[in-house]
Amino acid sequence: MGSGAEASVAERRPFPVSWDQFHRDCRALTWRLNAVGPFHAVVAITRGGLVPAAIVARELGLRVIDTICVASYAHDKQGELQVLKGVSEQTAALGGGTGKGLLIVDDLVDTGKTGRMVRDLLPDAHFATVYAKPKGKPLVDTFITEVSQDTWIFFPWDTGLSFQPPLKDGAA
């Protein structure tokens, strides 16, 4: 995720999120978004935004879901951003070309680099994330849980069930 003086993955605070907790957090996000809408469509930032976008779209009753693919992570290192796939012309037209009435959803805003790039493409869209870190938080319109910048979130789709040693044995 980071480079240089930033903490390595091993030095970060682990924050495991279960499927149940993630679903509850997405529903809480939707509850907040309900007061902000209405929205014409959901735009998921792939890949992390796919699952929360599906939950949010269901809860808001939205059927139009599009994706924007911005790549910044290679395993545990954060690199240069690239838009690998933009929103469709149909979705962009729903937002008048500026994103008005579109809801951008991602799992997390970290440094804000991805959010800035998407904001540049859809400046009038509403940007929502489930989790937010301090550096990226100013870019997000709506989020549920703030975590510290040195936190590494383990999302349920990135983890498997395995034995965890007790904390007294030096487990993180």
From Swiss-Prot:
Its EC number is 2.4.2.-, 2.4.2.22. It is an enzyme of class 2 (transferase). SUPFAM superfamilies: PRTase-like (SSF53271). PANTHER family: XANTHINE PHOSPHORIBOSYLTRANSFERASE, XANTHINE-GUANINE PHOSPHORIBOSYLTRANSFERASE. HAMAP family: XGPRT. Purine salvage pathway enzyme that catalyzes the transfer of the ribosyl-5-phosphate group from 5-phospho-alpha-D-ribose 1-diphosphate (PRPP) to the N9 position of the 6-oxopurines guanine and xanthine to form the corresponding ribonucleotides GMP (guanosine 5'-monophosphate) and XMP (xanthosine 5'-monophosphate), with the release of PPi. To a lesser extent, also acts on hypoxanthine. Homotetramer. This is Xanthine-guanine phosphoribosyltransferase. The gene is gpt.
